[in-house]
Amino acid sequence: MQLRFLQKNKEEKDMIIAVAGSGGKTTRVHKLAQYYRSLGKKVFVTTTTHMKKESDTVIPENIEDIRKQLNETGYCMAGMPATPENALVQKIGPLPEDFYETAVKEADITLIEADGSRGMPAKIPADYEPVIPENIDEIHIVIGMSALGKPASKVVHRLSLADKDLEIKEDTILTPLHLQKLLKKGYLGPLREQYKDTKIKVYPGQADTLYQRVIARFLQEEKDVAQIKDDWFKIQPKLVIFGAGHVAIQLLRIAKFLDFYTIMIDDREEFADPEKLSQADEVYCRDFHDIEDILPEQDNTFYVVVTRGHANDRLCAETVLRRPYLYLGMIGSKGKVAKTFEIMKEEGYSEEQISTIHAPIGLKIGARTPEEIAISIAAEMIAIKNHETESTMSKELFETKESGVLCIITKKSGSSPRGVGSMMLVTKDGIIGSIGGGNLEKTVMEEAPSMKEITRKEYDLSNAQSATLGMICGGKNEILYVPV
C-alpha cells in the first residue's frame, strides 16, 4: 500500500528513510536519529502505521507545534493519537498529509516507522505492508535475531500468511535459513521490484549473542547463512560431578584445565566445601534426592557419578536419565555396575536408557590411583565431546560483547592443529579464542582488521608456505572472516 506524500526533488540534500520489518524498528529509528543529529541535521520522526508514544513525542494541534520543536531542538517525533487515553501503552498514528508535507520541508532527515509487528521479532507482511511513502530515498528492513531457536507461533507476526516456500509452521523452530527466506520473499523481493531506484538494505536487530551477531552480519550482507553451523557456537560443555571425594577432586582439576564449567555436588558439608573446591564454578551441599533445580538445562552437559555409596550412585544416574545430557558416566566395579543396572531394570528403566551410561567409567588404561582414574574419565569425556560436537568455544568467547572480526576455520586438511569450527575474535585490544597458534594464527590476526566484509581466504600450509607459516606437517585451512 502507498500513501501519496510530498514529491521530493531528488537533488535536494534532504532524505526520507522508511524503516520496516520487525524486531528493532524503533531502535533503528533512534540510532539513525542520533547519527544524523550528531552531524547537525534536523531530524523528523513519524509513522505511516503506528509506533509507541515517547515522553517527548509531539501530538500537534497545528503545524507550528512541529516546526517549533524542530527549530528549537533539532529533533521532533510527531504523530496523532492511535490509542485511547487510558491505554497501558500509548501509540501514535500517521499525521494529516499537510502536517507531514510541511514537516518534511522543515527537516533535513525524515525517519518513518513504516510497519507494525505487535512486538514480535519476525513478521510475514500482508500485501498492503509495509506502508512506504512514494518519495522514499531509502528503505531499511529490520528483523529480530531473538527469533532464532524459538517456535514460529511465539515469534512470527501474521504466521497464517506463510506459504509452502517459507517452510514455516506453528511448531517450526526458526533457523537462520527461515529468517533469510522470510526477508527475501516477504520484503527484499517485492520492495526491490516496486522501488527499483531506491536503496534497500537489511539491518538486523536484537543481536545479543556472538552467534546472533554472526547471523545478523550474513543477513545484512545477504550472504548464504548455510555457511554457518550453530554447533560451532556452543559453549564448552558443563560438567556435573556427583560426589566430592578423591577421584572427584582430581577430575575437577583436569576439567578446569580443559575449560569445562564445573559443578560439584555432595551431601556432606565437610566435602562440599567451597574453599576446598575453589576451582569449581558452583558447589552445592544437597541431599541427592533434591538436586533437580541446580542441574543445567543445556543438552551438552556431562555428568560423572562418583558418590560414596551404591544407592546414591543409582539415584544420581536415574535423575540424569530423566533429562537431556551428552555424557553420563558412573564409577564402580563390573559387579557393582551389573547389580545397579539390574535394580534399575526392575524399576522400569529400559535397556536402551541404561546402555547410554558409561560404566565402569573411563577409558581402559589400567588406572589405579585417583589421578589416573580421573585422567581415564577425562579422556573418555574428550572422546565423546569431540565426536558429538565441533565446538571448541571458550566461555570467554561465548559471552563476549566485544566488536571485531571473527575468524573461523571452515575447512581443513592435513595436520593443521585446530579443527573446523575453531574460531578467534580479533579485537582492537587483542584476541579472544584461538585457531591453533603459530604463524598461521599470527598471519590471520594481522589480516583480520582489514576485513570490512565477510571474506573467505585459504591458507595452503604445504611445502614452502608451510614452513613460512610455522606448520611442520602441512595442510590447508580455509578461514572465514566475519566482522561483528
Language model features with spans:
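Adenosine-phosphate binding glycine-rich loop
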Residues: 331-397
